[in-house]
């Protein structure tokens, strides 16, 4: 009898912890529980009820949401919605302003998250993975007529309100067709209601858009975390192992001892000198189908004016008198081949050449030809 009471107490405690989010657990407690690798009882019906994969034919407006939204969602979920629309149409996703999942760990959505993927015949592009409570995910427009939404929660802590995503056709809106509800109000169609939202362009991850996204990262570690949050450390290590004879060829000029008198004279007479200049690699190399990290590099380029304050100085231009090419080692991507797991073959360290101006001359139209 005592054994039965003990088992009932454990089951009750485990089930109630799924709903209680009033207290914020300490990070140490979280790690301890995760390391213990505790599992829910397989007899718990929620485990089977919420492990689903559903295909939705998008003919109008509707939504998908986490179970029990806007309350705490259950644990141990793996839900997938595959949205399909007619050919020559696209699908728009808009997140409800009430959004909250378990917080990220080290800025990585590792445990509870919602993920959106663009699906085509040739590739799958992850549009984003979100968790936490800080901000609502952006509006998303699919590249094709297919898009996939995945929601995952682990065996431990849950949060509320979860999420709700409204979907709609971008073109040729038709009256919403009724769809079957497969589980506990997780999926629903909005019948007789026109769901309109502002037309905001959501750039897909083509080269130009990815180039802008890369601008948000300060380190290559942050960049790899974005592409592969689960395997970025392995990608970072393999980046150098893939090159059998890795040898960086980047170099910089040696600087001679500064001559203050000469600098002062140059400022008065010829401020046309090589100086640091930031160039966008894609623009500099005229490559439109690849992106680089870092996006920009410092080079020496001629700048300033000529003979500032002297006669005819406005008619002079500062041009390169000697140009050399220098090697720079960067990380190169081909966006169409980026994969979620593992490092794509088209992501590699490469050497590029950029022009550096070593000497600058003033060319003045008033000066007679030499």
Swiss-Prot record:
Activated by proteolytic cleavage. Proteolytic removal of the N-terminal CUB domain releasing the core domain is necessary for unmasking the receptor-binding epitopes of the core domain. Cleavage after Arg-247 or Arg-249 by urokinase plasminogen activator gives rise to the active form. Homodimer; disulfide-linked. Interacts with PDGFRB homodimers, and with heterodimers formed by PDGFRA and PDGFRB. It comes from Pongo abelii. The record marks 247-250 as: Cleavage. The keyword Glycoprotein applies. GO terms for molecular function: growth factor activity; platelet-derived growth factor receptor binding. Residues 52-170 form the CUB domain. One of its GO terms (biological process) is cellular response to amino acid stimulus. SUPFAM superfamilies: Cystine-knot cytokines (SSF57501), Spermadhesin, CUB domain (SSF49854). GO terms for cellular component: extracellular space; membrane. This is Platelet-derived growth factor D. Glycans are attached at residue 276. Residues 1-18 form the signal peptide. It is found in: Secreted. PANTHER family: PLATELET-DERIVED GROWTH FACTOR, PLATELET-DERIVED GROWTH FACTOR D. Belongs to the PDGF/VEGF growth factor family.
């Amino acid at each position: 009898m005592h054994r039965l009471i003990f088992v009932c107490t454990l089951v009750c405690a485990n089930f109630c912890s799924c709903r209680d989010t009033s207290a914020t657990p300490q990070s140490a407690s979280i790690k301890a529980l995760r390391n213990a690798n505790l599992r829910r009882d397989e007899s718990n019906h929620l485990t089977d009820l919420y492990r689903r994969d559903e295909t939705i034919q998008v003919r109008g407006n509707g939504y998908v949401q986490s179970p029990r939204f806007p309350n705490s969602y259950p644990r141990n979920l793996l839900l997938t919605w595959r949205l399909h629309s007619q050919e020559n149409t696209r699908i728009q996703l808009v997140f409800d302003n009430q959004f909250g999942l378990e917080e990220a760990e080290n800025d990585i959505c590792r445990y509870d998250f919602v993920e959106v993927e663009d699906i085509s015949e040739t590739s799958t592009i992850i549009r984003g993975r979100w968790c936490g409570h800080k901000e609502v995910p952006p509006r998303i427009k699919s590249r094709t007529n297919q898009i996939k939404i995945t929601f995952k929660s682990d065996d431990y802590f849950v949060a509320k309100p979860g999420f709700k995503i409204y979907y709609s056709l971008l073109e040729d809106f038709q009256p919403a067709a009724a769809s079957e509800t497969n589980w506990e109000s997780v999926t629903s169609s909005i019948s007789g209601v026109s769901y309109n939202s502002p037309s905001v362009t959501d750039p897909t991850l083509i080269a130009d858009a990815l180039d802008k996204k890369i601008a948000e990262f300060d380190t290559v570690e942050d960049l790899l975390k974005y592409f592969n949050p689960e395997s970025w450390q392995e990608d970072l290590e393999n980046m150098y192992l893939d090159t059998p004879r890795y040898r960086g060829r980047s170099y910089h000029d040696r600087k001679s001892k500064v001559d203050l008198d000469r600098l002062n004279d140059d400022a008065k007479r010829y401020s046309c000198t090589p100086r640091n200049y930031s160039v966008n690699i894609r623009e500099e190399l005229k490559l439109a189908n690849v992106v680089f990290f870092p996006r920009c590099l410092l080079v020496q380029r001629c700048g300033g004016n000529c003979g500032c304050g002297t006669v005819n100085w406005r008619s002079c231009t500062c041009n390169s008198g000697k140009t050399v090419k220098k090697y720079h080692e960067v990380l190169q991507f081909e966006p169409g081949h980026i994969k979620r797991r593992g490092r794509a073959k088209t992501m590699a360290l490469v050497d590029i050449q950029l022009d550096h101006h070593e000497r600058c001359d003033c060319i003045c139209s008033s000066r007679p030809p030499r």
